[in-house]
Amino acid sequence: MNQTTTFDKLCNYSAACLANWQGKTIVVKYGGNAMISAELKQTVMQNILLLNQYGINVVLVHGGGPEISLGMKLLGKEPQFINGLRVTDQDTIDVVLQMLAGKVNKRLVALLKGKGIGLCGIDGGLIQCEKLEAELDYGLVGNIVQVDITVLQMALAANLIPVIAAVAVDQQGIIYNVNADTVASEIAVALGADKLVLMTDIAGLLADRNDERSLMSRVEVSQVETLIAQGIISDGMIPKVASCTRFINAGGIEAHIIDGRIKHAILLSILSDKQNGTRFYKEK
């Protein structure tokens, strides 16, 4: 069965379910291997366009880590990360603007066949930040302090799909790199979104990081601190889980870390309760 046939069958199967989502809002953070593989990229764009066709408001926030790292290496600089966050100096910011807000963003918009509108956190005052204050200095990494959704509301009202690069600006006009998972979460909170979806390169949150069979399919947010203390949530998973927890604690119904290596993972996260990544929720 070819990819087109598979997608057509999935569309037919999903019609009734997606009709129930009409008028609802989903924020998707797109990144990882699904941005590198041409085949996976195609299925992601198919999924996003299908949701749009059913009247579902979709906001796509993207990373671009591999492209940024490539740009850094071309400058003779080795990328550095601490706790999953990129250490960012002025040279890195320049690369982020060129690669993330430029090349990556516009190529994604092009794949959305006239339905996408390319934005970054600087545009329309969308994301205001301040320098992230931490025990370790991450450089020009921002902490989001305000989200102005005016430009997003205008785009969604025009039935467009905002495609947002994760950069932001402070009150002095200094540009910062901002974690894309955090951007997606804060935008989802500000929009009052119905669902937050974060794409990653693993099956989800694993009780044993070396065994995908140990997938934790559902996590109640009150468990998160314990899971961090146990080392189950660590490294790059920390900002992802923090983003999910933030969304849920702000009133969001469901946050979902999905396996971006699976074809049509976005659609499946809506259509199926089967083990597809890790769903975060709050016990009522």
Swiss-Prot record:
UniProt keywords, alphabetically: Amino-acid biosynthesis, Arginine biosynthesis, ATP-binding, Cytoplasm, Kinase, Nucleotide-binding, Transferase
User: Can the keyword Protein biosynthesis be found in this entry's annotation?
Assistant: no
Which residues are recorded as binding substrate?
G64, G65, R86, N177
- Location in the cell: Cytoplasm
InterPro entries associated with the record = AceGlu_kinase-like_sf (IPR036393), AcgluKinase_fam (IPR004662), ArgB (IPR037528), Asp/Glu/Uridylate_kinase (IPR001048), Glu/AcGlu_kinase (IPR001057), NAGK-C (IPR041727)
Write out the catalysed reaction.
N-acetyl-L-glutamate + ATP = N-acetyl-L-glutamyl 5-phosphate + ADP
**According to its UniProt record, in which pathway does this protein act?**
Amino-acid biosynthesis; L-arginine biosynthesis; N(2)-acetyl-L-ornithine from L-glutamate: step 2/4
The record places the site described as Transition state stabilizer at K29, K240
EC number per UniProt: 2.7.2.8
Q: Name one GO molecular function term.
A: acetylglutamate kinase activity
Tell me which Gene Ontology terms the entry assigns under biological process: arginine biosynthetic process via ornithine; L-arginine biosynthetic process
Under the cellular component aspect of Gene Ontology, which terms does the record hold?
cytoplasm
Q: What is its main location?
A: cytoplasm
Function, please?
Catalyzes the ATP-dependent phosphorylation of N-acetyl-L-glutamate.
Family, similarity comment: Belongs to the acetylglutamate kinase family. ArgB subfamily.
Instruction: Provide the protein name.
Output: Acetylglutamate kinase
Q: Which organism is it from?
A: Haemophilus ducreyi (strain 35000HP / ATCC 700724)
